[in-house]
Swiss-Prot record:
NCBIfam families: moaC, PRK09364.1. Its EC number is 4.6.1.17. Catalyzes the conversion of (8S)-3',8-cyclo-7,8-dihydroguanosine 5'-triphosphate to cyclic pyranopterin monophosphate (cPMP). SUPFAM superfamilies: Molybdenum cofactor biosynthesis protein C, MoaC (SSF55040). The gene is moaC. Homohexamer; trimer of dimers. The keyword Signal does not apply. Keywords: Lyase, Molybdenum cofactor biosynthesis. GO terms for biological process: Mo-molybdopterin cofactor biosynthetic process. Transmembrane segments: none annotated. The lineage of its organism: Bacteria, Pseudomonadati, Pseudomonadota, Alphaproteobacteria, Hyphomicrobiales. One of its GO terms (molecular function) is cyclic pyranopterin monophosphate synthase activity. This is Cyclic pyranopterin monophosphate synthase. Substrate binds at residues 78-80, 116-117.
Length: 165
């Protein structure tokens, strides 16, 4: 039998389980993720001018992303509850898209990584943007949600290479 990548959440009987991280060393863990919401140029202008019916789209989406990162273990069944030390969500306009680009970073000192927290922050920020602007543009597209980098832990550091939009 070949040795290679394996699914850590599946036991020898093929059953899903939560990984035991009790014996792992505590290290600083940082992960970054990104995504985008593509929309019509006039929808982007509406958001940037602060004229969306539901209010401050970017500010609300930023807070939603931060709140979501803190709730990841309640949303994804096998994620450990974590004591995050920092979560940031940055949302910037991109006229070339056109739309908004979302980047999130999650950090802690602990025994397991924060990739899912960063990805959850981006996902929920994107969904919040869609929710708040859907009255103006139901054809918005959410995409490109992916891990950009992670550091810390036994598996080492990772940085996504090349532009893969």
């Amino acid at each position: 039998m070949m040795s290679g990548p394996r699914l850590t959440h599946i036991d020898s009987a093929g059953e899903a389980h939560m990984v035991d991280v009790g014996d792992k060393a505590e290290t600083e863990r940082v992960a970054a993720a990104e995504g985008f919401v593509r929309m019509r140029p006039e929808t982007l202008a509406l958001i940037l001018e602060g004229n969306a019916k539901k209010g401050d789209v970017i500010g609300t989406a930023r807070l939603a992303g931060i709140m979501a990162a803190k709730q990841t273990s309640n949303l994804i069944p096998l994620c450990h509850p974590l004591m995050l030390t920092k979560v940031s969500v940055d949302i910037v306009p991109d006229d070339a898209l056109p739309g908004l680009r979302i980047e999130a970073m999650a950090k802690l000192k602990g025994r397991t990584g924060v990739e899912m927290e960063a990805l959850t922050a981006v996902s929920i920020a994107c969904l919040t943007i869609y929710d708040m602007a859907k009255a103006a543009d139901r054809e918005m597209e959410i995409g490109g949600i992916r891990l950009v980098s992670k550091s810390g832990g036994k598996s080492g550091d990772y940085r996504r290479g090349g532009d893969q939009d």
